[in-house]
């Protein structure tokens, strides 16, 4: 923008740097609006960008109007649709992805986990350092990690061996220098192996073609028109992709030949064989063999998590369906998440390097803030597990338990008919030959939400809570996070002998998939019957 243009717009627009706009709007709304929040709006065309002498400015009124709509109109719209008030303080809607996945919380993706800030919110208000908390539906260990950060002792139970592996890697103590040395050596060996597979000229030419189309057809102006609903995304993208595929087809004919060199790798593992290209299967298999050769069992588990996380990111699928796989995609596609042409990953190297360094960094960061507290991870069925017997294997923790028993529960049971918890990590179970216990899941998606499924769900959750009560002290506080759209929890609490103290209704704004309908979850605060 030249000086004349600047003079023309200055009287009409109040332009500020993103940093200045963040400070002004935070003060105005009494709610922290960070620089990255405004940068996101600029990046995705929600507000205009003004560039003057290589500095980015925004119109403060435009940004303010966006947040007014977000804070007030959206709240009103959601509450009208749902028919009741929501606890917006629990939305944590302006947290960045980095904050929602701080330190070891971000070591491995896990669909259906709550954010650590939600756990922290309730632990700070209802529990003390030295207390013992139990999570009978541990998942990836969010509650246990947050307890460790706050000096609270914790116990987690999960039916899935892989979930227990994720949690264990988050909570273990490490020799950081040894960890770095072994993991970086494994990374470098994999790089050398991949390099010897040969350069892929096809990928280079494909990327050039994608870049050409994105620069011409999926510009910032296109994103702005989308946000203002001035263009039909489906029809426009379909038309452009038809043109793209004509050129792409010629590239494939020129460069791609039938190459069955790696065709037999993972042929006996149906998920891996279906969702990964031959080259990627070869790279995954090479790193897997390095894991098998690793003699340090603690670090071996970290390497397993790095490979699993890498495998998840290099599946042949679209960015907007990463959480719920539909059909394999190995060619470029229009991406509804990024509003441009994207392509599936062609090699594991970029992700493997990124995740190796990221996991090391997260573990090192957590090692500096973790407190001195006990934790216990139990791979078992929460309906029947004897926590006392498990604690006896850890004498110091058991002595603490004997003197006070368990002070509370903070957990999020499976949501009826929404997630298949084993299937979401099918790649990991096959990679590491981990036994699957799908039939022992409570309320999985594959069983649906029929009357029969609801009855089984009520019995399953009730059995867990009844079993847990045996190990709680009489003043224990219980918090359960769930989306109770079938209104099953009143009966569950009656069966379990629990009294509802309060229900919080938390709006969930940052969802993985394209569904943007109003969605909330309940946080039930409970106590035991006297």
From Swiss-Prot:
An annotated GO cellular component of this protein is: cytoplasm
Return one Gene Ontology term, BP aspect.
methylation
Keyword Protein transport assigned? no
The protein's matches in SUPFAM superfamilies, at most eight in alphabetical order, are given as: S-adenosyl-L-methionine-dependent methyltransferases (SSF53335)
Q: Which residues form the signal peptide?
A: none
Q: Which reaction does it catalyse?
A: a 2'-deoxycytidine in DNA + S-adenosyl-L-methionine = an N(4)-methyl-2'-deoxycytidine in DNA + S-adenosyl-L-homocysteine + H(+)
Per the UniProt record, which EC number(s) apply here? 2.1.1.113
Q: Give the Pfam families listed for this entry.
A: N6_N4_Mtase
For this UniProt entry, the molecular function terms from Gene Ontology, in alphabetical order, are: DNA binding; methyltransferase activity; N-methyltransferase activity; site-specific DNA-methyltransferase (cytosine-N4-specific) activity
Going by the entry's taxonomy, the superkingdom of the source organism is recorded as Archaea
**Sorted UniProt keywords:** DNA-binding, Methyltransferase, Restriction system, S-adenosyl-L-methionine, Transferase
Major enzyme class = transferase
Spell out the family assignment given in the record's similarity comment. Belongs to the N(4)/N(6)-methyltransferase family. N(4) subfamily.
Q: What is this protein called?
A: Type II methyltransferase M.MjaII
Species annotation: Methanocaldococcus jannaschii (strain ATCC 43067 / DSM 2661 / JAL-1 / JCM 10045 / NBRC 100440) (Methanococcus jannaschii)
